[in-house]
Amino acid sequence: MKKTLSLLLTFLLVLSLWLPALAEGEQKELIFWTRINDTFEEEIAAFEALHPDVKVTRVGVGSSYDDLVTKYIAAAVSGELPHVGLLSQRYGIPQIYDAGVLVPIEKFMSEEEQNDIMAAYWERYTYNGERVAVPFQSSMPVLYVNEALLAEAGVDVPTTWEEVQQAAAKLTKDTDGDGVTDVFGFNIPDDAPWYVNALVREAGGEIIHEDGTVSVDIPQMVSVLRDIQQMAAAGSMPSNQHGTAKDDFKNGAVAMLFNSCAGNKSIAKGVEDKFEYALVTFPAIDGNVSAPIGGNALGIFKSDAETEALSWEFVQFMTSSDAVSGFTMDKGYLPIKYSFMETDFVKARLADSFWAATFDQVQHLQGQRVNPVDATIWSELNDILSEIESDPGADVEKLVRNMQREVDDFLLDY
């Protein structure tokens, strides 16, 4: 793949030599906000090679999507906004859109272009009846399994949530007999609410409704949280160790891990050759598999017509087949368009035993409706998880009722 990227960049750079050169002062600047570590150096270089009259200035704003949202809201007041920005799928889009600074992405797209985007993405990036951003680096949750530990314990790869719980108990071990667990059967990283929402949806729960109302106090939410509480109480899942879950899996201290498909490069680097692991389909409930969309989108901010048009050219390039296959999907992210499923890259992934289950799971992609209360739900769920994992006697139903009140209060004041 590195060879392919090098050839692509070489081709674009050669092509740029045939395009008219402009003086530095005549260049049009595009401001592109991302998180600090999202450099996009290769992508920007490739775009600039095709557009020598354009200078893309990437500005890293904070280390998290929280920081980005805070900066966008502040910039909406000051007027110092970027032309293009990275938007988290998780939260912030409603607030930014309601501030009146975001141009609906559908304004720039033909009907054919919109129809090529997989429908699940529009579920997530539609707000107030408008398609406000275009999916970019998109991911979904999968189950990572340490194949060596499963084989040693004689445990089959689980395909359901119930089987995950059963397998976790069998995989949990005190290897040296000192009374301290050395290998936990299962854990969830610090983006735990993402996986909880997936399980709730698989169980038939709907959190954000079409009319904008929000229901978190539902039986499916209580059931999933009780399962997690019981696993922590039984010791098959460590209590409140979400922050180290990925590293623990890399070191063989956790046998099964919920994680993003886009997290594989980091996992592979950490595991090295210590053991074999696999990415398998997210475990089902009642035969239902839910693959909620993660990752981010690209949004265009209001400016003049010429700059907005140029911003759309940049977004088009970043979400094109060549760019996504050569850069984005190579990092573990997903195809965002139906047409991408016919590319050589995706066909190769479907034929690759390591990636086949992940790319086959694309058919189960689901986008939870965007809502201003997203961040509140996320925060409340993290608080509940912290309590129920440390207290086996915590009243899950009461905690969920309290979360519903927080949600209702937020929406009442919004």
Indicate where each model-derived feature is located.
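Short, low-complexity disordered leader/linker segments with a strong preference
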Residues: M1-L30, A49, R401, R405-Y414
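Long, aromatic- and glycine/proline-rich binding clefts that accommodate carbohydrate-like moieties
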Residues: W122-E123, D273, Y277-V280, M329-D383, ...
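Extracytoplasmic "Venus flytrap"/periplasmic binding protein-like
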Residues: A46-I117, R124-T126, A148-T159, A253-M256, ...
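Short, well-ordered beta-strand elements
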Residues: E26-I36, V54-V59, H83-V84, V132, ...
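Hinge/lid segment of periplasmic solute-binding proteins
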Residues: S88-P141, D156, Q165, T181-I188, ...
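Extracytoplasmic "Venus flytrap"
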Residues: E29-I44, V61-Y65, S139, D191, ...
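Glycine-centered hinge/linker elements that transmit conformational signals in sensory
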Residues: A167-K170, D211-S239, F282
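Extracytoplasmic/periplasmic substrate-recognition and gating elements
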Residues: A49-L50, K55-T57, S78, E152-A153, ...
